[in-house]
Amino acid sequence: MIILKRNIVFLLIIIIVLGIFIATSIEIKNYKLSLNQNKNEISKNPPIWPAPFYGQFGNNSILISKEFNFTIISDSTLLLNKTLSKYYNLIFTQDNLINSSSNTLNKLNINLKSKNEILKFGFDESYKLIIKNNENSKLEGNTVYGIMRGLETFYQLIKYNFSDNSYFIENCLPLIINDKPRFPHRGVMLDTSRHFYSVDTILKVIESLSYNKFNTLHWHIIDSQSFPLSSKSYPNLINGAWSKSEIYSYHDIKRIIKYGKENGIRIQLEIDMPGHAKSWSVGYPDLLPHGWNDSTTTIKCPDYDVPLDPSSPLSLPISFGLLSEFSGTDYGYNPNYDDKSNNLFNLTVDDLFHVGGDEIEYQCWNNSKRIKDWMNENNLKTFQDVAKQFQLKIIKQLLKIGKIPVLWEDTFQLFYKDLPKDVIVEIYHDQSTAINATNNGYKIISSIARYWYLEYSYSNWIRAYNFEPTLNISKSNIHLVLGGEGAIWSESIDSSNLFQKLYPTSSAIAERLWSPIYYTNLLNAKSRLQSFRCSLLKRGINSAPLNNSSPLSAFSCYNS
């Protein structure tokens, strides 16, 4: 009996080992098959992230001479020169002892086709990079932003040999890359209300986004918990900030927008309304519903999520004033500020403006006699009618001042087919809402929480990489998917752990939004992402390891 049991155990072990071997063989076979089927899918060497639209690679290498320079062969701009200088300094941080010769790479010709530097939705980021030999190497872009994306690719191609103090490009020449993004809107949302981030931290976020070939920082600047936005139209609003030192001044905002342009990153502001408005009331108490915090009522209003009172005589003027002030326009809603000499109304902000519209707690309006009387006067039957009227006025105001309204999906669910078609809907609950919105002709931005919310403990790069934002959307509606965003909600995140939460998961989102849809091979992606993570660490971006929130033991970054 004992011998029989041992034989059974031995047989089970053999079956398990054989099963693992077969599964591994199938996985490797499928991996090779995937690479063979997708002829454009980039090899693990060179490990470019995000993968380009098209790449053709040889097997040769080349040394880079110490005389190497970027040679502009077209018209130049200050921003182009600044970008080239930035990447030169990022690349060449060590001694280079290689003299120039006919066998070394001595220059990269830069051809800028247009001096147009307007940074708005849909701007051109395409580029072409050719490296054959010293006499036939160039980077070409229709705009300086295409040159930026191409320089990031060039940066990732270059390696350094400490044994002979040389820079080189390895085993991929001759090289031709034709690259462009799959989606026009690719970003990360950063919540600066739950925790305040310094301007320098936000600038570092912008820089890291450019390395990932993102193009948008969605700045969720205010919320219920704090109001750190300094308004010269309504200066008492900053009384809702966490402290007097945790405020974004007008100068700070201009600095962030300027740095965004220098890195090819649009800054899309979000001023969430009418929900999440408790912090507004610290400076202007009449903005909230009377009786919202009445402890004697049976229907309680959550004190962290109190909405504006649309019946308040201040609600629309302050809301319109903020939209006008931070859109760079003035339509008479800024009574406390009429001195335009200091460029308050010259903010260069994005053409998309996010106004929230999510999670309106209707029970907070239920305890207010003023709201109910106002509803009767205006023939509004339900609190949904109240929300619709307010939101429609905000949407029309944004369109009046030349901005494209973006709202969370709650507003689409509130209006359904009656929502103006100018509105872009940001989807965060479920893909079924994305399908429903696009079937009804609405443009969408995808930010599905279970895949692309970065603060969750289960958030990881594989989960993010495997989500396809066009999943089950009809072919005729694919054009309505404008792109997507990873989201950082900051209840449990501050400057101490921000970048570990951002990366590498956001990098996976970056490739999903930039690269062709057929890039789905996880083995290939893991190899390239490990290399890219090392390049982030080298540049001071503190990305977490791929498989854990912190290192488990001693390893090279290429194996973490």
Curated annotation (Swiss-Prot):
GO molecular function: beta-N-acetylhexosaminidase activity
Subcellular location: Lysosome
EC number in record: 3.2.1.52
Presence of keyword Signal: yes
Annotated signal sequence range: 1-25
Classification via Pfam families: Glyco_hydro_20 (PF00728), Glycohydro_20b2 (PF14845)
Family to which this protein belongs: Belongs to the glycosyl hydrolase 20 family.
Domain of life of the source: Eukaryota
UniProt xrefs under InterPro entries: Beta_hexosaminidase_sua/sub, Glyco_hydro_20_cat, Glycoside_hydrolase_SF, Hex-like_dom2, HEX_eukaryotic_N
GO terms under biological process: carbohydrate metabolic process; glycosaminoglycan metabolic process; N-glycan processing
Main EC class the enzyme belongs to: hydrolase
Active site: 359 (proton donor)
Job of this protein: Responsible for the degradation of GM2 gangliosides, and a variety of other molecules containing terminal N-acetyl hexosamines.
The protein, known as: Beta-hexosaminidase subunit B1
Residues the record marks as carrying a glycan: 59, 69, 81, 99, 161, 293, 346, 366, 436, 472, 547
Listed GO CC annotations: lysosome; membrane
Keyword annotations of the record: Glycoprotein, Glycosidase, Hydrolase, Lysosome, Signal
Residue ranges of the TM segments: none
Catalytic activity, reaction form: Hydrolysis of terminal non-reducing N-acetyl-D-hexosamine residues in N-acetyl-beta-D-hexosaminides
